């Protein structure tokens, strides 16, 4: 949805999508833009440093928006290593590429899961940007680790970064196991 929005709003921008197409990925969703001369799809993982550096050398991006993530809480409990690899190591690879190739802006798409859980009997409570990190699963811990790494790269190397901690993004093409499609189906 982000790619469609950006190509429509900024038709002169070059948009490159790097995606390893895990179980929730579906290349056919990009069919409407595959022939757009300002769009390129690359099937690789953000954990593959050589592939990421090669792509940066070929495309010379100005900015990076990192949507890449393993993002299912239950799956993170079954196999946390995959989450640590993609969400933390992959973020480190992207941050190193941003340093090496002089990226002017990096945006980390995170999750509200880094804040933990709110008590169900307290509807008056809510999260803010100042809420302390209080993770409750390997998934949320891996995303919090990535967020902290991004902030460390900003402080240590001066990289211009932003982080958003969204709650249950939804829209066309969303994988059916995610919250909103699951609620609609049930």
Q: Predicted segment positions?
A:
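Substrate-binding strand-loop-helix patch
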Residues: 170-177
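Short, intrinsically disordered, charge-balanced linker/junction segments flanking boundaries
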Residues: 183-186
């Amino acid at each position: 949805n982000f790619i469609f929005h950006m190509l429509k709003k900024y038709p002169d921008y070059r948009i490159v999508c790097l995606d390893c197409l895990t179980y929730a990925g579906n290349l056919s969703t990009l069919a409407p833009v595959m022939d757009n001369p300002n769009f390129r799809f690359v099937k690789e993982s953000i954990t593959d440093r050589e592939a990421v550096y090669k792509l940066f050398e070929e495309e010379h991006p100005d900015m990076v928006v990192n949507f890449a993530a393993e993002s299912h809480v239950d799956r993170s409990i079954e196999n946390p290593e995959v989450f640590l690899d993609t969400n933390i190591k992959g973020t480190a690879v992207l941050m190193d590429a941003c340093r090496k190739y002089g990226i002017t802006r990096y945006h980390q798409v995170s999750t509200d899961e880094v804040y933990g859980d709110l008590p169900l009997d307290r509807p008056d409570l809510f999260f803010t940007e100042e809420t302390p990190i209080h993770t409750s699963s390997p998934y949320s811990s891996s995303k919090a680790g990535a967020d902290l790494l991004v902030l460390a790269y900003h402080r240590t190397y001066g990289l211009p970064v932003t982080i958003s901690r969204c709650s249950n993004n939804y829209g066309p093409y969303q994988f059916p196991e995610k919250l909103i499609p699951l609620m609609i189906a049930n």
